[in-house]
Amino acid sequence: MKHLIIIAILSLALFGCNSIKEDNKNNFFLPPATTYNYAEIDSVKLFYRAAGDKKNPVIVLLHGYPSSSHSYRNLIPMLSTHYYVIAPDNLGSGYSSHLDPKTTKYTFDLLANYTQKLLETLHIENYVMYMQDFGAPVGYRMMMENPNRIDALIVQNANAYLDGLTEKRQNFFRTAQTDTSKTKYDFLYSLTGKDAVVNKQYLFDLNETNMNIQSPDAWTHDLVFLNSKKDRDIQVQLFQDYNTNLLSYPKWQNMLKENQPKTLITWGKKDLKFNANGAKAYLKDLPNAELHLLDAGHFAAEEKTREIAELILKFLDKHDIK
């Protein structure tokens, strides 16, 4: 009789496990599909990726150099189940229009202007803003114009303090603006080539033991849009304009101090270009910001996608942005 009872219990347990397995098979995670879109603004096409329900709170992902919205291809599906996610390509980057730099002067004011117009075209008023690298000068210009539209900030290796730049790095940006010689131009132009993009950007913060965490898809995609002299000159002009951001840091810092936006800082602490002091400096003006120094480099969203997604979801849930 005891054996029958034991067999019966084991049978129920086995059946229960099989049922759970079957349920899991039928309930695996399916994120909303990402769509690939163009909006025409002032006769210019801006490309953007979108995913999620438009009724949900909006997250806008602003990319850096030398990339595009492609840098968020893995992050988007991790956020879009709960949020409506928009990731535009800057004017002159990725699939957006590449206007001739001989007739269009590329500045961060220009990029911010077009990105703001894109959000207006999409009827997006309030949003969480995620910024990385070049995304910071674009995003902070937008925030200066309309600080009340920002529900929260997510800062990922996005500098707004001189603390995050070595003196050598500061001098690089200053001379990029002031030195108009051909020698300087040739140097800046060389930074947009294949070797610099791969080895001085994506692999710069890595070592031989962890090279395999960085997908070659990233730089392969970027280099397609840095294939011509025109494309590379666009980025040279942005290098030449970058010092305007350093000069704007005090204004941005005052804005942050006055508005106290809910802020999550997820910073790759191995970043040699925008070092971790730049992350810590935010706490001077935003003492309530949440700071996480990640075991990653400048492209932390490529290296630590899942960890960043988890931090974002927990942070937004904690602040009732859902």
Regions found by a protein language model. Give the residues of each.
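Positively charged n-region of N-terminal signal peptides that target proteins for export
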Residues: 1-4
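Sec-dependent N-terminal signal peptides
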Residues: 6-10
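C-terminal motif of bacterial Sec signal peptides marking the signal peptidase cleavage site
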Residues: 15-16
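Flexible "cap/lid" subdomain of the alpha/beta-hydrolase fold that forms the substrate-access gate
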Residues: 22-38, 42-46, 51-54, 86, ...
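Conserved HGGG/HGGXW glycine-rich cap/lid loop of the alpha/beta-hydrolase fold
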Residues: 50-98
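A short, glycine- and basic residue-enriched loop/turn
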Residues: 68-69, 137, 297
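Surface-exposed alpha-helical interface segments used for non-catalytic interactions
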Residues: 70-73, 77, 113, 140, ...
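Catalytic histidine-centered segment of alpha/beta-hydrolase-like enzymes
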Residues: 297-309
